[in-house]
Every structure is written in C-alpha cells, then in structure tokens.
C-alpha cells in the first residue's frame, strides 16, 4: 500500500506491519512514494518483504513460538536481518548485455553502495548524538563524500528525531555477517548458507549474545553430520 500523502513527510521510506498473532495472513507493506525511487523498489521490497521482514516474521510464526515472543523484539536482529536480506537479494539481480564477471561486479557495487550509505548515516548519528556535531560540522564531514547541504540537513534532522535508529541496521547487519563467517570457518566445505539462514530464523528476534550461543550450538550439531 502507499503511505498517505499527509504522512509522507514524516514516514519512513517503507515499513512492514507485523500481523496480529490471530491473523497471520494480514501482511502489509507500506511504500512512501515520496521517498522511494522506482530503481530502489527491488531492494526496498527485499528488505521489507521477501526474504526480509515479512519472510522472517512468518517463518518464525510457523515454528509455533510462545505468544510472549511476539512481544519481544530486538531492533538489531530485526533490522540486521532486513539489511542482510536486502544485500543478499542482489545475488539474484540480472543485468542486460553483460558477461558473468561484469554482472558479479555490478552486484557487488550495489551492495557496497548500500553499505556505504548506511555506514555514513550511522556515523552521522554517532557524531551528532554522541560527539555533539552541529549541522555545519556534519556538513563539513559529509561533503568529503559528495553529500550536499540539502541532504545533510535532512539527515541531521532525522538523527536528532530518531537517535541510534541507523545503528540497528548497520551493526545488526555486521553482527549477522560476522556470525555467518564464523559458521563458515568452523564447517569448512560442509558449510551451506541455507543452514545459517535457517539457524538465525529459528531462533527469532533476540540479542546477539543469545543468537551467537544458538548459532554455536547449531554449528556443533552440523559438524557431527557425516
């Protein structure tokens, strides 16, 4: 659905509404057309829909968890998975009239661009809310990356109104990426990315200390499979 015009100025680019536990089929994604360009729709829907939040939520609900778990959410896990799914989805993008090597490079370019944008936003959040940067100081920092004053003003206002929000996306992603690498290193040639995804989704939303313990247990189980 489209975000109503009256709310578009303050709404996020897109968001997924978690369905009630007694109405699991009510899965709705809202798109803010004033903030999402058509060429961003693929990654946006990957983050909010499949294999992002919508898939994550419905997968976990299919495990028949305690109803209490539906109230317990950790933003780092949730937005980390959404970002992980968004970046992973580029593995399935196709570009016209390019060879395999160029296609792989373009996919990586899209991932790197998303990560750079997210990392700069997260650093801006820290500089403003922790190091007390004012708008001019932030503009001086961001202009070295080609970001103009208009974009800086919007970002400055956002991180003031929503402190540490960006960090749940960036740190959440990097935590998941670290766990994936650790599992891959432990299992070697027997590592399958689907096993990692399943292990993460089976645990559900939690802090990374718990998730790390559960991934370690699953890794030990998988290592004993001949």
Predicted regions and their residues:
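Long, His/Glu/Asp-enriched segments that create or flank divalent metal/ion-associated functional microenvironments
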Residues: 1-226
